[in-house]
Amino acid sequence: MPLRSSQSSPPASQSFKRKQPTISSFFTKKPPTSQEKAQEPEDEPAASRRQFANALDKATRVKEHGAPAERDEEQEEEEEDIVAPAPKRIKTNGVHEKEPASAAKEVSSASRPAPPLASSQRTELYKFASSPADGAGAGVDRPEDPETKQRQAERERLHQLFVKKLGGADCAVGIGRSAGGDAPSGAEEAAEGDEDEEVAPAPAAKGRGSKKAGGGKLTPLEKQVIEIKRKHMDTVLVIEVGYKYRFFGEDARIAAKELSIVCIPGKMRFDEHPSEAHLDRFASASIPVHRLHVHVKRLVAAGYKVGVVRQLETAALKAAGDNRNAPFSRKLTNLYTKGTYVDDVEGLEGPTPAASGGASPATGYLLCITETNAKGWGNDERVHVGIVAVQPNTGDIIYDDFEDGFMRSEVETRLLHIAPCELVIVGELSKATEKLVQHLSGSKLNTFGDKVRVERVGKKKTAVAESHSHVANFYASKLKAASVDDTQTSNLLQKVLTLPEQVTVCLSAMIEHMTEYGLEHIFQLTKYFQHFSSRSHMLLNANTLVSLEIYQNQTDHSTKGSLFWTLDRTQTRFGQRLLRKWVGRPLLDKSRLEERVNAVEELKNPEKTVQVERLKRLLGRIKSDLEKNLIRIYYGKCTRPELLTVLQTLQTIAQEYADVKSPEDNGFASPVLGEAVASLPTILKDVVAFLNKINMHAARSDDKYEFFRESEETDEISEHKLGIASVEHELEEHRAVAAGILKWPKVVYVTSSGIEYLIEVENTSNAIKRVPASWVKVSGTKKLSRFHTPEVIQLLRQRDQHKEALAAACDKAFAALLAEIAVNYQLFRDCVQALATLDCLLSLAAIASQPGYVKPEYTDHTCICVEQGRHPMVEQLLLDSYVPNDTDLDTDQTRALLVTGPNMGGKSSYVRQVALIAIMGQIGSYVPARSAKLGMLDAVFTRMGAFDNMLAGESTFMVELSETADILKQATPRSLVILDELGRGTSTHDGVAIAQAVLDYMVRTIRSLTLFITHYQHLSNMTQSFPDHELRNVHMRFTESGAGQDEEITFLYEVGEGVAHRSYGLNVARLANLPAPLLDVAKLKSAELEEQIRRRRLARLLTAVGEVMSDPAKGDEDFLERLMSTAEQL
């Protein structure tokens, strides 16, 4: 009970009483001096003083930090009494206002004045230099107190009572707790109360039995959070608490940073670290329930692993259960990373970027990689690598097993092709591979235009045996079921079980990894296992993808200006993904290639306009990503409106061609088109059967209770619906009972602020006097009051329990429906794949319809014969017309071109144009040319550009030669090789020697089709060593005008025969706006060097002519050819 002053002197002013504790609370406790210790009363026990000081300290902290903003006058009065000035407290001798009568009488009978005190008990503990009380009694000796032992004992007892009452409900701490809000005791408010009691930012020492000074007792929610967090320390946890999702500790800091939300300060760690002992709660941040997936997507896109912890109980069912007084049960129900986020049909991609030339669309692959050191070391090092890549959004699985050299070009090629958003590394990687992975997944944006998330998994010495056992057990049940009636599935499963060792290790790790996210079912789709290195496709290595700008341009790494951007005219997301695969994996099978290009030709044919427009209209009506929708149904993560949309879309597709019974009935001559169209109506029967179970309007509005048609509802759903109807009927009958009690026949139920079945009674009517005391007043106004009767409260509780059970039954039935649809996943997926094929073919047909595109002619002979060919991307980006050029390469005739010409003359664009036309042709597309005859190339290799590899400690020239060495090892007579200015990274003599040796090896030994760009005019003499013209000199044509200072160069961008003997680098320097004086000096130096070289050549020519004149026997045919060549150079 609060202390009251019993003195006769006038009380201190209200302002003084309030300022005193506030000022002193800002200063730490000052230890008493020896003089002060001597002045302390000897008759008061030291334990009592310490308890009194601790109690005052707690009260002061509560007033500073924990007192609510709004307090009534009584609360303020009580707190003011607690912290009243000490001199006035001394005169009361520490006696409560409501003391026993004897004590009060004893105090009142004491007529002598209290002796003056140098410092009271409070000012002795909290000194403030400017306090008038401190100086009032300074230097005054306190006389001995003549109190009796009985009075001392009574005083001690009263101090103990005060300390005990400080933590009671009616003290300042209790007032702060009640104002802050305690947990509601009603069952209906359990969810809200759990949040208020456990999570609200409580000040120190707030709450009964939960003194958290120095990290004391934890609330039940905090215990739950710590228990879950310790099992998932690498995960950002989003925890459902009442009607919000909350972050705690370090997770709250991350959420505040990434989501731009408020973080309430507190503990960041979960290990009770001493550095946070002064904090009494965890840092926290919160988001609304309906915005969960919006914020989860942002965290996942930022590279975090996010876990969602949900409440497994509802308020109504918890109130009716046996654990109504325990906290809500919570469990980690969902885990998400960039590669495993499938809970939103759009995933992390957002709108289609390719159409606007934005960033390259993410493939969404998770790639698992492991390696062992095969043999060798240094530059001869060979490693054995296994990979498994999974795309959870579509169900595709890619695997490969290969050896790689010290440059790791094979690993880089696969990483660039697959473009994973997440890597799982099994075991330790070699330094070279580790550096490559770091380069592609570093903190900065990588070549994919995104950050790659990396997880590492340990690898035991017995990993191979354990992995094989794990994979075998995973597929055991499926293999047993398939062996009876499905030979194809059995063969596919046997193929999976006989994968190479490194692939099996990766597959086992990926199964375990995906199980953590509940997506392990994807590996049961064995039909979609694909080998990366299938020889049915052209090989485009990492350098080729970058140099030829297959997926991204080299300027800003967006899709605009890439080959994929040029060919992409698709209308659907799944069609766009398939086209991306086509672009990166051109065909090698001539028959398949001819089928595809014939299909494009038929779609381009004006006679097929009706059929083509019908297909375009059908694709235009597909607004959802069916491939992702189907895999979400397979995972059981599809929503009700989404399921309705998918089934209705599939029904539209099937009904459009319901009249097609066979591939010959669809109006297309091409077998590719015929089979694709004929597969569309095969799903109609199943789709209609599923749609007949669904209430369309309820599904569209996401009404789980009416989702199924009445005839399709389960017994459990019907039972709870009848229970709800019964309760509502009883509520209606009870209205008449309430009317009889009030003797007012017009009683009706009303709903106010979401609270149903309220009985309104006017405050001025006679009925208000007849309201029983058992009725609960819920709300009211000046004119009326609203009540719940005890019967209504009980019936509403029963109805809520039925509603909760009904919701669970509806979710269970919906999950069963999704599982039933998932049985037909492969049938539906094949239909969507057929539609994607049609979309890609229509896209290629749109390209073929552009002016200047021609259908290529394919031959088994290795050659590239193009007349008036053009660069496909530059042509679309340029406003002016592109200058076409001819190309004639044949493995039996001229198989190499030595390309020279001035800087900026178009050499690199020309060789890229040749490579891109060859790739487009093997994709099955028309090519930008007047005519084209193409052989089946097995690979395109490029060595272009100049850059170093600082991570690997390799110089520009080292990188250049290492890439060249890889090309020489991999190239075949059916490959196209492009080498751009090889040897420029070293001295002229060494560069010429290396370039000449490599070119000779390519032409004579490997016999690949080769385009070799150089500024070394000396290499042009190599053509003389190839009498059958296997190597030819060509140059980029230009015209010169003016002389000296006024010399100008005009680039014609045409390929001509012969050699360009000058590079005209000074022209580029002038275009780059180098200072004029610098250009003048450069021109003089260039002229001097050219004159020196010309004089040397002339001197050698004159010497040779003199020798011939003196000895005619030396003038053989070879000598005369060299003589003529020297004269031409002059």
UniProtKB/Swiss-Prot annotation:
Q: What name has this protein been given in UniProt?
A: DNA mismatch repair protein msh3
Binding residues for ATP: 901-908
PANTHER family documented for this protein: DNA MISMATCH REPAIR PROTEIN MSH3, DNA MISMATCH REPAIR PROTEIN MUTS FAMILY MEMBER
- The annotated regions of Basic and acidic residues compositional bias extend over 58-70, 141-153
Give Gene Ontology CC terms. nucleus
Protein origin, superkingdom? Eukaryota
Q: Which GO terms describe its biological process?
A: mismatch repair; mitotic recombination
Task: Give positions of region: Disordered.
Answer: 1-153, 177-217
Homology family: Belongs to the DNA mismatch repair MutS family. MSH3 subfamily.
Question: Gene3D superfamilies, from UniProt?
Answer: 1.10.1420.10, DNA repair protein MutS, domain I, MutS, connector domain, P-loop containing nucleotide triphosphate hydrolases
Residue ranges annotated as compositionally biased, kind Acidic residues, are: 71-82, 189-199
Instruction: Please note every region of biased composition (Low complexity).
Output: 1-15, 108-120
Where does this protein reside within or beyond the cell? Nucleus
Listed A to Z, the keywords are: ATP-binding, DNA damage, DNA repair, DNA-binding, Nucleotide-binding, Nucleus
* Subunit (UniProt): Heterodimer consisting of msh2-msh3 (MutS beta). Forms a ternary complex with MutL alpha (mlh1-pms1).
Biased composition, class Polar residues, residue ranges: 21-36
Q: What does this protein do?
A: Component of the post-replicative DNA mismatch repair system (MMR). Heterodimerizes with msh2 to form MutS beta, which binds to DNA mismatches thereby initiating DNA repair. Msh3 provides substrate-binding and substrate specificity to the complex. When bound, the MutS beta heterodimer bends the DNA helix and shields approximately 20 base pairs. Acts mainly to repair insertion-deletion loops (IDLs) from 2 to 13 nucleotides in size, but can also repair base-base and single insertion-deletion mismatches that occur during replication.
Classify the main location: nucleus
Annotated segments matching region Mispair-binding domain: 212-339
> Iron-sulfur as a keyword?
no
* One Gene Ontology molecular-function label: ATP binding
Gene source species = Aspergillus clavatus (strain ATCC 1007 / CBS 513.65 / DSM 816 / NCTC 3887 / NRRL 1 / QM 1276 / 107)
